[in-house]
Swiss-Prot record:
Family listed: Belongs to the ABC transporter superfamily. Ribose importer (TC 3.A.1.2.1) family.
Sites where the protein binds ATP: G51, E52, N53, G54, A55, G56, K57, S58
ABC transporter domain mapped to chain residues: 19-254, 253-509
Keyword flag Nucleotide-binding: yes
Subcellular location field: Cell inner membrane
Protein name according to UniProt: Ribose import ATP-binding protein RbsA
Domain of life per record: Bacteria
Length: 517
């Protein structure tokens, strides 16, 4: 039975909810996707909707936007019941959904995109002047810096997003749903979007914000509602938000259990040794050891050289100096193929551009690194590859209907597990992970942490690069910190230098000495 968490959120006494969804249920082929979900949104509120993949967030929002029709439940706008049967009736009710994949016509002007399907006319002709004037007014209200006559395809992604928002405002929308709106944005573009969202909030527009990025939720949300397994778990106010409570609500267990790794007090023998490795530019001569069953965290600010170290070891980039040893034997690694041949794996930070073959099947993506090993007289042993892929799907809880599903059609979390499965198929002695949970929801993070901990327990030596300090602190047996291309510090609880976020940042910024444990 689900227990709801009460909230102290106190809207003005006279405030009527702009949106109430009560008892919403939806089934697909008899399987419940939503079960009695409630959601209440107030004017001028940024309301975050959170939950892991499959929790029901997208289904609930598609019902609100008219893409699906609920099997049960009621929707009220400003206290009045409404029937939303298609996207048109949703827009008439003042609801607009801005998808992660932008819905703009790149070859048309900003004005033409804003008024698409609702053009202004004078007699039998389009009234372009009136449309451009109204478009300019809406864009000005958003603080946009581009012109109504600009071609949308020439704009940055963040500006194209503003075009979509402008189109919604032109339709007098009072409820905006934003689904992972920062997924393709830079940090600067993200902050610009936040400014727009805050302005919309001040204008009384309600925003339902879907994101797995905790830092965005803390920066924007007035309240948070959480779904899990198609059920409403509860809501929190800004004051009640904490990582511990969110994790417990989303995955059903405490933060203490989130990072399952038990720190190694007596790690195994040295497996990987790096001596004075350098690319002559971004990485100054760096030396360290990595032991069997150890998770070695590599921390530092963006641009510190962490990724570059991993790529040098893997042979993806050319080193100008340094040596790499595996089990005491000097390696000659000139390419990733050389690294793979000796049992060194590397999960890159950008799974879409550097890791996966998106149009290829899940089966082939998983088996890619085993094809050479399993080839016999030029004939691939697909039976072996199929078994590896089937076992990986089961062991890693990869959610897909069948092995022929393309990687591009999977969620971020399942894509990342697919990539992990590919590297584990070669039975690596050393596995380097670069931002292993970037762009995945909290449920997938928990599963990936379990996989990493299991590998460590099996004796795999793991080098983990991460910008998420709780991840580094929660999983690492030791932590090396880089600053401006140099290794500047080591944290290890067993030698009296405590692994904490504060101590990592002291080294990363050069601010002060670390705190002893």
């Amino acid at each position: 039975m689900t227990t709801n968490i009460k909230t102290d959120f106190s809207p003005p006494a006279t405030a009527t909810p702009v949106l109430e969804m009560q008892g919403i249920a939806k089934r697909f082929h008899g399987v419940p996707a939503l079960q009695g979900v409630n959601l209440t949104i107030y004017p001028g509120e940024v309301h975050a909707l959170m939950g892991e993949n499959g929790a029901g967030k997208s289904t609930l929002m598609k019902i609100l936007a008219g893409a699906y029709i609920a099997d049960e439940g009621e929707i009220r706008i400003n206290g009045k019941g409404v029937k939303i049967t298609d996207p048109g009736t949703a827009r008439q009710a003042g609801i607009n959904l801005i998808y992660q994949e932008l819905n703009v016509a790149p070859n048309l002007t900003v004005t033409e995109n804003i008024f698409m399907g609702s053009e202004l006319t004078r007699g039998q002709f389009l009234d372009r002047k009136a449309m451009e004037l109204e478009a300019q007014q809406v864009l000005a209200s958003l603080g946009a810096s581009f012109a109504p006559t600009d071609i949308v395809g020439t704009l940055a992604i963040a500006e194209q997003q503003q075009v979509e928002i402008a189109r919604a405002l032109k339709d007098n929308s009072r409820i905006l749903v934003m689904d992972e709106p920062t997924a393709a944005l830079s940090d600067r573009e993200t902050e610009r979007l936040f400014e727009v969202i805050r302005k919309l909030r001040n204008d009384g527009i309600a925003i339902i914000y879907i994101s797995h990025r905790m830092e965005e939720i803390y920066a924007l949300a007035d309240r948070i509602s959480v779904l899990r397994d198609g059920q409403y778990i509860g809501s929190l106010t800004r004051e009640e938000i904490s990582p511990q409570r969110l994790v417990q609500m989303m995955v059903g267990r405490s933060m203490q259990d989130f990072y399952e790794h038990q720190r190694q007090s007596n790690p195994g023998p040295v497996v990987l040794e790096v001596r004075n490795i350098s690319d002559g530019r971004k990485v100054q001569p760096a030396s360290f050891q990595l032991r069997a069953g150890e998770i070695l965290g590599l921390a530092g600010l963006v641009g510190a050289g962490r990724t570059e170290v991993s790529r040098l070891i893997f042979g993806a980039d050319r080193k100008v100096s340094g040596e790499v040893f595996l089990n005491g034997k000097k390696l000659e690694i000139h390419s990733p193929s050389d690294a793979i041949a000796v049992g060194i794996g590397y999960v890159p930070e950008d799974r879409k551009d550097q890791g996966l073959f998106l149009e290829m099947s899940s089966r082939k993506n998983i088996g890619l690194n085993r094809l050479k090993q399993d080839a016999n007289l030029g004939i691939v042993n697909w039976g072996s590859v199929n078994k590896i892929a089937t076992d990986a799907v089961e062991n890693f809880h990869i959610r897909l209907a069948n092995l022929e599903i393309r990687a591009v059609d999977l969620s971020g979390g399942n894509q990342q597990k697919l990539l992990l499965a590919r590297w584990l198929a070669i039975n690596p002695r050393v596995l380097m992970l670069d931002e292993p949970t970037r762009g995945v929801d909290i449920g997938a993070k928990s599963e990936i942490y379990r996989i990493i901990s299991d590998l460590s327990a099996q004796g795999v030596a793991i080098l983990m690069v991460s910008s998420e300090l709780p991840e580094i602190v929660g999983l690492s047996d030791r932590v090396l910190v880089m600053r401006e291309g140099q290794l500047v510090g080591e944290l290890d609880n067993s030698i009296g230098k405590e692994i904490t976020q504060e101590n990592i940042m002291h080294y990363a910024t050069g601010a002060s000495e670390v705190t002893a444990s």
